[in-house]
């Protein structure tokens, strides 16, 4: 078989990517027990997990950003309310978030790699977004303490070349997530604890 092959010397740069990652946090204290927090962050990811659902064989591969694959970018916005009770023995918070995702990557629906064919020929690129809320309650004082958390989240992807251009749930979408952690302090040196997690 004769084909075009590109070889790079060890340590030779192929493509250079960079991006700013600003983070902004804001807190407003209503009083000594209540506060409101808001935040914004921008993040880049330069290594990507590419998945395919049209094959019976494992096709999840990690690929770096390159001349053909741009870095993934995420913008996240958050807003939360925080409250302490009874001399900070109890804590409660409710947070809402929205995340905008660019340059998401998947395999095309009909891609089957042939001998000598660059795997990059099977990539398709699109956008994603996720949003939801997180509720959290914690008891931190006393012999019996612990915390309870609940997360409701929606994670979507949309590609022009997948699912007729319609949005679809991301592979790792977890709509509901409940976590419970309990600890009982028998004495200063011994305690019993347990954790329960439910996710859909």
Show which residues each predicted segment covers.
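Repeated loop/turn-to-beta-strand initiation elements of outer-membrane beta-barrel proteins
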Residues: 33-36, 87-92, 143-146, 188-192
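Gram-negative outer-membrane beta-barrel transporters
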Residues: 97-100, 117-200
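Residue-level signature of outer-membrane beta-barrel architecture
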Residues: 18, 26-29, 42, 71, ...
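Signature of Gram-negative outer-membrane beta-barrel scaffolds
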Residues: 1-33, 46, 162
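Hydrophobic, lipid-facing positions within transmembrane beta-strands of outer-membrane proteins
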Residues: 20-26, 36, 65, 75-79, ...
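Outer-membrane beta-barrel translocator domains and adjoining extracellular loop/strand segments
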Residues: 2-7, 20, 49-57, 62-64, ...
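Membrane-embedded beta-barrel scaffold of Gram-negative outer-membrane proteins
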Residues: 37-41, 47, 51, 70-121
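Transmembrane beta-barrel strands of outer-membrane/channel proteins
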Residues: 1, 38-42, 60, 81, ...
């Amino acid at each position: 078989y004769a084909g075009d092959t590109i070889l790079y010397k060890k340590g030779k740069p192929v493509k250079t990517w960079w991006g700013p990652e600003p983070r902004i946090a804001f807190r407003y204290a209503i009083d000594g027990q209540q506060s409101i927090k808001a935040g914004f962050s921008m993040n880049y990811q330069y290594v990507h997990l590419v998945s395919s659902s049209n094959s019976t064989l494992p096709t999840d591969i990690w690929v770096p950003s390159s001349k053909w694959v741009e870095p993934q970018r995420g913008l996240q916005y958050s807003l939360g309310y925080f409250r302490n009770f009874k001399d900070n023995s109890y804590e409660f918070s409710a947070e809402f978030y929205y995340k905008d995702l660019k340059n998401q990557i998947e395999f095309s629906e009909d891609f089957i790699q042939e001998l000598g064919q660059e795997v990059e020929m099977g990539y398709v690129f699109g956008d994603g977004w996720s949003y939801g809320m997180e509720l959290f309650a914690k008891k931190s004082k006393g012999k019996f303490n612990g915390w309870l958390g609940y997360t409701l989240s929606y994670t979507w992807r949309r590609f022009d070349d997948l699912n007729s251009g319609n949005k679809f749930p991301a592979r790792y979408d977890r709509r509901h997530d409940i976590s419970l952690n309990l600890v009982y302090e028998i004495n200063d040196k011994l305690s019993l604890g347990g954790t329960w997690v439910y996710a859909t």
